[in-house]
């Protein structure tokens, strides 16, 4: 890629991407534009500006994407009750298509002919970033330094930084032993002692949540208001999508909700252990299923459940911008037209317990479902014909002597 003149770098301001910035300048003799996304990771993003300026960067983008992230990515995903391999709420996966989108937008705005990222050659993120980039700008060049250079250890990165006067602190506050990624939906932990699947995670690793043992001894009740499948208010107070998720993170974290320790199957072929804190997302998943339980038609609900694992895999594997994901999203969104109402939850020591749900669009009819006298709302004699018709094929097979036991 000797013809690269300008590169947009997804830049955090940390060691890896600061080294990448200088490496791009030296290796490709190109201009670098930095892009730093505020996705609600809870850290200051402005220091990235000073670091980029110190390395001679002239065009610096620092964007607050919190509302767009939750509104256009997290909320649509939760309309599908999305969960990967039965446990993972896709906190890292769902952030990558937005970052890829913004990288391409900035490349178009600045006339850059390439983008670059700090994802390693072992992980899923390289796939997610690049699939998104190619979908949105087919001819874009992608530079992935971890697949090119020989700086394959933290010590080598530190040595490179010192040699090139990159402003990175070698000493100071103790560095976390984990590789972490955070946004408004979750925080993840990988590496360190977690690479031994038998070793228990350390209590002081967790940053967002209290342990269930340390959570309050009295439950917290909340009410979530839904419109078209999305939460629009907490306890009657209207909030934006990002405000909703931030508040649910706070409440859930206080009550020890949302911790997860799993081994997942990466798209690149290996198994990887990760620990996650997703307090708000854990509450959202439980509540959304509760409001759907009274507002969705049975067959629509079952079809959504059948398609959800495919939808989850598309997001996990980086196919957010694919035609099949977009097609599924249209179906999912259409199913949410009547998913309106209020869900009441009890939060207690790591548990999310549904205690009530109500909706003007509810399909629950107490007159039909009652165990008491229903006044003829449901004719129980109709069940006999229903059962016989459903048994017909099995009765025919049995009549032909087919043995079942």
Swiss-Prot record:
> Which keywords does this Swiss-Prot/TrEMBL entry list?
Amino-acid biosynthesis, Arginine biosynthesis, ATP-binding, Cytoplasm, Ligase, Nucleotide-binding
The record's comment on protein family reads:
Belongs to the argininosuccinate synthase family. Type 1 subfamily.
BP-aspect Gene Ontology terms: argininosuccinate metabolic process; L-arginine biosynthetic process; urea cycle
Q: What is the protein name stated in its UniProt record?
A: Argininosuccinate synthase
Spell out the reaction equation it catalyses: L-citrulline + L-aspartate + ATP = 2-(N(omega)-L-arginino)succinate + AMP + diphosphate + H(+)
**What InterPro entries does UniProt report for this protein, alphabetically?**
Arginosuc_syn_C (IPR048268), Arginosuc_syn_N (IPR048267), Arginosuc_synth (IPR001518), Arginosuc_synth_CS (IPR018223), Arginosuc_synth_type_1_subfam (IPR023434), AS_cat/multimer_dom_body (IPR024074), Rossmann-like_a/b/a_fold (IPR014729)
Please verify whether the record's keywords include ATP-binding: yes
- Which EC number applies? 6.3.4.5
Keyword Iron-sulfur annotated = no
């Amino acid at each position: 890629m000797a013809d690269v003149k300008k590169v947009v770098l997804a830049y955090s301001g940390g060691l890896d991407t600061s080294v990448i910035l200088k490496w791009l300048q030296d290796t490709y003799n190109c201009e670098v534009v930095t892009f730093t996304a505020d996705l609600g990771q809870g850290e200051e993003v402005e220091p990235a500006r000073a670091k980029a300026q110190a390395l001679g960067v002239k065009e610096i983008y620092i964007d607050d994407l919190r509302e767009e992230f939750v509104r256009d990515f997290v909320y649509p995903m939760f309309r599908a009750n999305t969960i990967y391999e039965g446990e993972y709420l896709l906190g890292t996966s769902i952030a990558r298509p937005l970052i890829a989108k913004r990288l391409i937008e900035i490349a178009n705005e600045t006339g850059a002919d390439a983008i670059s990222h700090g994802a390693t050659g072992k992980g899923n993120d390289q796939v997610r970033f690049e699939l998104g980039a190619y979908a949105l700008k087919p001819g874009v060049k992608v530079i992935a330094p971890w697949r090119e250079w020989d700086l394959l250890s933290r010590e080598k990165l530190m040595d490179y930084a010192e040699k090139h006067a990159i402003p990175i602190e070698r000493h100071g506050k103790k560095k976390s032993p984990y590789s972490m990624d955070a946004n408004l939906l979750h925080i993840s932990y990988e590496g360190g002692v977690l690479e031994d699947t038998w070793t228990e995670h350390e209590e002081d690793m967790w940053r967002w949540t209290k342990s269930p043992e340390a959570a309050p001894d009295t439950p917290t009740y909340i009410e979530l208001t839904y419109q078209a499948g999305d939460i629009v208010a907490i306890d009657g107070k209207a909030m934006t999508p990002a405000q909703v998720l931030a508040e649910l993170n706070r409440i859930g974290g206080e009550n020890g909700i949302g911790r997860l320790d799993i081994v997942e199957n990466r798209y690149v072929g290996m198994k990887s252990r990760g620990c996650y804190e997703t307090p708000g997302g854990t509450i959202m998943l439980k509540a959304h299923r509760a409001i759907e339980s009274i507002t969705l038609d049975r067959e629509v609900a079952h079809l959504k459940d059948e398609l959800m694992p495919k939808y989850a895999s598309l997001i996990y594997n980086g196919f957010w911008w694919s035609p099949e994901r977009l097609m599924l999203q249209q179906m999912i969104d259409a199913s949410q037209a009547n998913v309106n109402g209020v869900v009441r939850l009890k939060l207690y020591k790591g548990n999310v317990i549904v205690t009530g749900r109500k909706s003007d669009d509810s399909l629950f009819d107490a007159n039909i479902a009652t165990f008491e006298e229903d006044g003829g709302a449901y004719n129980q004699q109709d069940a006999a014909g229903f059962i016989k018709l459903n048994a017909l094929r099995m009765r025919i097979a049995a009549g032909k002597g087919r043995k079942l036991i």
